[in-house]
């Protein structure tokens, strides 16, 4: 048993200690960047999914795939898993979600009264934990872990997610793949896979792809296998394989009358920091002696690190910022230091809000690519590569995506009353170096070095070091003049 547990631990964590696989050299030889919009939309009964082409050079350089899902009222996104770790940012709305970790106990139990139908009574339903989410939440989904999501309110849920296809835990190719557990819908990245293979694929192969389009993972098994595996009749098997699906159901279905599952109450924003304590509360685990309460200390190592870990953290506008300037804006980050689940993903995220005409000074990320998604408003953004060439100089508007490769320098200036963005980063502990302002690279250089490096006079070198007292966010010049006056 000890060897089995040890092997399972090694399987879960083996890819996490290695360094991130480097992208192909030519994929990051970028002379020009563009703000990208989604180019594919798949409609479903309860909403729709939009995707960006992962074959585009910037996505290939970053080794990620991006999608955006919109859930209407009472919409359920069917369970699925992917070939790489995911980060999901809730741009809008509230709801519930669940993840299924193989080997973890089902610690949630539905109330007995909800299971009654007339005089008959069914066994109580037990399942793994259901979590609530709200706007601004960052959700961590490890590789191969199945998850589902449901909108129980009137406001549509908009969720933006990345899949890290360059992760060492992805042992397939770099094409993102989503494996649905149910339904008969189109896999949102299949179109791009077919485009990539189109040149070498025979007509017969194309026909096979079309026939397989819209199948869930169970549909490929022989019905007799599933009948025996689940112990059910053939009618149920046909449903499991998606044969009785409405044509327009898709990956997002509408639950008539609403979904009734047990979920914890939504915690107030100021209680978010106490989530770790909530995860350590004793849980009810079914044994041959009935319901046994177990504390975190009494469970095995896998339970402590996987089954009870916190899966979401709020980094939106209602969270406590890491950097705040009342005239310029705020920045909030989530790394594995404060959100340990990100250690499994080797990913992190940053939320930023810039007031009109405020600037995020030129800076670069030392150890990660950045996938910047504009949540609201617009900003003028400039990106510079290693040759000193401006590879992007334009507006990034709401719904647009800009990929900034590792070590490329970037600066942004808000053009609207409030520019908001979320930046996904391909490292769980990213380091950012600012090129101007307090604590910047130039600020840390000796004055004499600056003077002779840039051919400046002593007073000019002093101005370069000390004229900007702000670290990352610079207020509009008019507000600085008012403050001086």
From Swiss-Prot:
What are the recorded GO MF terms, alphabetically?
Answer: nutrient reservoir activity
Q: Write out the residue ranges of the motif Vacuolar targeting signal.
A: 476-485
Tell me the tissue specificity: Exclusively in seeds during embryogenesis.
> Which residue stretches does the UniProt record annotate as biased composition, category Acidic residues?
272-281
Comp. bias regions, Polar residues = 108-118
The secretion signal range is 1-18
The intrachain disulfides are 28-61, 104-307
The protein's job, in short, is:
Glycinin is the major seed storage protein of soybean. Glycinin basic peptides (GBPs), and, to a lower extent, glycinin exhibit antibacterial activity against Gram-negative and Gram-positive bacteria (e.g. L.monocytogenes, B.subtilis, E.coli and S.enteritidis) by forming pores and aggregating in transmembranes, leading to membrane permeability and, eventually, cell death.
What name appears for this protein in its UniProt entry?
Glycinin G2
Q: Which organism is it from?
A: Glycine max (Soybean)
**Gene transcribed to yield this protein:** GY2
């Amino acid at each position: 048993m000890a060897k089995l547990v040890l092997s399972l631990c090694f399987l879960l964590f083996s890819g996490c200690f290695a360094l991130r696989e480097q992208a192909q050299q030519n994929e990051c030889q970028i002379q020009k960047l563009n703000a990208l919009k989604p180019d594919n939309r798949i409609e479903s009964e309860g909403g729709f999914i939009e995707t960006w082409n992962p074959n585009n050079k910037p996505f290939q350089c970053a080794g990620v795939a991006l999608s955006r899902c919109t859930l209407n009222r009472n919409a359920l996104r069917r369970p699925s898993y992917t070939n790489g770790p995911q980060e999901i940012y809730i741009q809008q709305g509230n709801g519930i979600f669940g993840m299924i970790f193989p080997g973890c106990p089902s610690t949630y139990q539905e109330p007995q009264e909800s299971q009654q139908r007339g005089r008959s009574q069914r066994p109580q339903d037990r399942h793994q934990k259901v979590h609530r989410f709200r706007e601004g939440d960052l959700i961590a989904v490890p590789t191969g872990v199945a998850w589902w999501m449901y909108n129980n309110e009137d406001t549509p849920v908009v969720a933006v997610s990345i899949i890290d296809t360059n992760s060492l835990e992805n042992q397939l190719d770099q094409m993102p793949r989503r494996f649905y557990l149910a339904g008969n819908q189109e896999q949102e990245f299949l179109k791009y896979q077919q485009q990539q293979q189109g040149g070498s694929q025979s007509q017969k192969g194309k026909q096979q792809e079309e026939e397989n389009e819209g199948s869930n993972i169970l549909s490929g098994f022989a019905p007799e296998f599933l009948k025996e595996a689940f112990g059910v009749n053939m009618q149920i098997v046909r449903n499991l394989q998606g044969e009785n699906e409405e044509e327009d159901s898709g990956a997002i279905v509408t639950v008539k009358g609403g979904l009734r599952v047990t979920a914890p109450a939504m915690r107030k924003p100021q209680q978010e920091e106490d989530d770790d304590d909530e995860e350590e509360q004793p849980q009810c685990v079914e044994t041959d002696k009935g319901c046994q309460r177990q504390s975190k200390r009494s469970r095995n190592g896998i339970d402590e690190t996987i089954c009870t870990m916190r899966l979401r953290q709020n980094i939106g506008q209602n969270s406590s910022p890491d950097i705040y300037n009342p005239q310029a804006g705020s920045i909030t980050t989530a790394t594995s230091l404060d959100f340990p689940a990100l250690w499994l993903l080797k990913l992190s995220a940053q939320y930023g809000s810039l007031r009109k005409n405020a600037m995020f000074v030129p800076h670069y990320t030392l150890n990660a690519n950045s996938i910047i998604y504009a949540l609201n408003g617009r900003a003028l953004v400039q990106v510079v590569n290693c040759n000193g060439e401006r590879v992007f100089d334009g507006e990034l508007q709401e719904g647009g995506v800009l990929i900034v490769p590792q070590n490329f320098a970037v600066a942004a200036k808000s053009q609207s009353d409030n520019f908001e963005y979320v930046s996904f980063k391909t490292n769980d502990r990213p380091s950012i170096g600012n090129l101007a302002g307090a604590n910047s690279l130039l600020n840390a250089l000796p004055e004499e070095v600056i003077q002779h490096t840039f051919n400046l006079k002593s007073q000019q070198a002093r101005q370069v070091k000390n004229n900007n007292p702000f670290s990352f966010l610079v207020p509009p010049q008019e507000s600085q003049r008012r403050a001086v006056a």
